[in-house]
Amino acid sequence: MSKEIKFSSDARTAMMRGIDILADTVKTTLGPKGRNVVLEKSYGSPLITNDGVTIAKEIELEDHFENMGAKLVSEVASKTNDIAGDGTTTATVLTQAIVREGLKNVTAGANPVGIRRGIELAAETAVASIKEMAIPVHDKSAIAQVATVSSRSEKVGEYISDAMERVGSDGVITIEESKGMQTELDVVEGMQFDRGYLSQYMVSNTEKMVAELDNPYILITDKKISNIQEILPLLEQILKTNRPLLIVADDVDGEALPTLVLNKIKGVFNVVAVKAPGFGDRRKAQLEDLAILTGGTVITEELGLDLKDATLEALGQAAKATVDKDHTTIVEGAGSVGAISDRVAIIKAQIEKITSDFDREKLQERLAKLAGGVAVVKVGAATETELKAMKLLIEDALNATRAAVEEGIVSGGGTALVNAIAALDKLSEEGDIQTGINIVRRALEEPVRQIAANAGYEGSVIIDKLRSEKVGTGFNAATGQWVNMIEEGIVDPAKVTRSALQNAASVAGLILTTEAVVANKPEPAAPAMPPMDPSMGMGGMM
């Protein structure tokens, strides 16, 4: 395929057009009075959203050079979303502002490499200032404030803060679609995995169709149990204690399953069997987690252990186990706090090293089950379109809240970025490097300008007044009042704010130092079939 090449200002100008198209679309959503954008979907109803990264990913431009500019900004939004989970619109606004001012200077004859150095230096300094401003987040009300600002909904803020209070900052909070119109929070305490009883005859509560075991022993093995003789010595020991038994094994089949069921029905002893969760190496890891949580040992040939030789000391224990047809939940395992803490530390270390998003998600689920539990926010709405929009809002709020717990909070509404400008006054460089610093200085004001504009105010007037206010005071675009942003609960996670600036500065610097752009040349359209002459008859037809 032949290529089309543009150089110097032609290349940068074409990319800037694409950047402007994408950024102008996304930035209308910024702030408490930001608007929505409607996205056409290839199937189903259109998506109405104000989520910056979702909008950016949908934009494809016909002109290849413009599209490359748009895709570079989309990459900024995606990267910010990956790191902090929110702040994608802010990152887009910052990128546009830095590139636009930078191009003016490059076109006027400035050295783009020097400007890039100045941009990077200013960004590093501003990020350090933002980190210094950060206030740690611990209490429930602060968490609710972060979620409320991100989602623009106090109700969502309550759901997120309740969920984090129940399962902890390491706990897993998942978002699912509700079957009804109401949004609700469901918290599963203890360890739960998606395996149910192997026979419905093991049910103890026929009304709810669940098996409930109080103070059970838990046999954990990666082996298949087909012969009852393999576990008979162990069953005899358990029978003497008059306590129930939960068997977690690779499988229970052959004569073993009907024998266990028969003894359950006759009331000889209370036993429930379930398959082990997961597959392959992930199954081994989950069984080890379960053993540590309950204070037991995995009966496996890898450790030289045999079911015939198992004793009560090898079994796990818990305050309660509940098993339905799809799930097993174990509450208050008897494992030692030290062993569980060590296991949690190992999993956290694995999460930091892992590169696969899927593997990271699975590790986080394991971590949550050990650390506290799983909370499920079930999103309800009147229509499918509203449901999709609500899910995106809650996902952003959840990500922002986690970022706030991790690195603290700063004044919201773009105020922290403007406050960080003071740190740039300490930088004293020359020539193009100083020009780059000044470009970032101007760009840091842009989010406040845009938030004000979206709320119907003049951005320049707001910025002029904000410069004269003391640090922490900002403009509440929702009410039109000047307030202490932290006290008013208008806050942003420090991680979100600094990630937006870091990613915007990085990509903007690369765009400004671009001297040539290579794109695929559009293929000429195939000639259309000539129209049929109506005077020509259809042969063979009357």
UniProtKB/Swiss-Prot annotation:
This is Chaperonin GroEL. GO terms for molecular function: ATP binding; ATP-dependent protein folding chaperone; isomerase activity; unfolded protein binding. GO terms for cellular component: cytoplasm. Its main location: cytoplasm. It catalyses: ATP + H2O + a folded polypeptide = ADP + phosphate + an unfolded polypeptide. InterPro entries: Chaperonin_Cpn60_CS (IPR018370), Cpn60/GroEL (IPR001844), Cpn60/GroEL/TCP-1 (IPR002423), GroEL-like_apical_dom_sf (IPR027409), GROEL-like_equatorial_sf (IPR027413), TCP-1-like_intermed_sf (IPR027410). Transmembrane segments: none annotated. GO terms for biological process: positive regulation of interleukin-8 production; protein refolding. It comes from Lactococcus lactis subsp. cremoris (strain MG1363). Its EC number is 5.6.1.7. Belongs to the chaperonin (HSP60) family. Pfam families: Cpn60_TCP1. ATP binds at residues 29-32, 86-90, 413, 476-478, 492. HAMAP family: CH60. It comes from the Bacteria. Keywords: ATP-binding, Chaperone, Cytoplasm, Isomerase, Nucleotide-binding. Together with its co-chaperonin GroES, plays an essential role in assisting protein folding. The GroEL-GroES system forms a nano-cage that allows encapsulation of the non-native substrate proteins and provides a physical environment optimized to promote and accelerate protein folding. It is found in: Cytoplasm. Forms a cylinder of 14 subunits composed of two heptameric rings stacked back-to-back. Interacts with the co-chaperonin GroES. SUPFAM superfamilies: GroEL apical domain-like, GroEL equatorial domain-like, GroEL-intermediate domain like.
